[in-house]
Amino acid sequence: HVEDENDSELKSFSLKRNKESLIPMIKDALKKRNNKIRIMASPWSPPAWMKTTGEMNFGGKLKDEHRETWADYYCKFIEHYEEENIPLWGISVQNEPEAKQTWDSCLYTAEEERDFIKNYLGPSLEKHNLINKKVIIWDHNRDIMVKRARTVLSDPDAAKYVWGTGFHWYCGNHFE
């Protein structure tokens, strides 16, 4: 995490909060499964200083001037987790990118997600030699998944970085 809004180089990045409970829990799970777990990380919000609302809760959007820094943040997160011997299989661009929640959330249109992937996240993964990490788009309800995926995947410059589409089963008839 980076709380310093002047740290666009992410020099103060720290996993201190994660080391309190999340990382020990993941390490226990990996140990019990002989390291045979695929772990996908999904951000719920950029730091408040990177967002239009100035807070992590209640939606808001990633500020244009922080798109490159946010893409590098993903890579820093992956690198730090791997230094903890926690290999990340993949990442999603954003948990529930169309949900304005009272908790950590950030809004992306399909076009914003597409452009972030092709212009920032994909190139940052390449720059940090992390292109083997799977990138999952959408990561939200299944009801508009196809429409949403079509927007991103119809652009070859974005699609080349995308492994697949993630979805939640929160809506509709659960027994179809």
Question: Where are the language model's segments positioned?
Answer:
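N-terminal catalytic cores of secreted or lumenal carbohydrate-active enzymes
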Residues: 1-89, 109, 115, 119-123
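A signal for specific C-terminal beta-sheet/loop modules enriched in small/flexible residues
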Residues: 44-46, 95-100
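Active-site neighborhood of glycoside hydrolase catalytic domains
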Residues: 68-90, 97-176
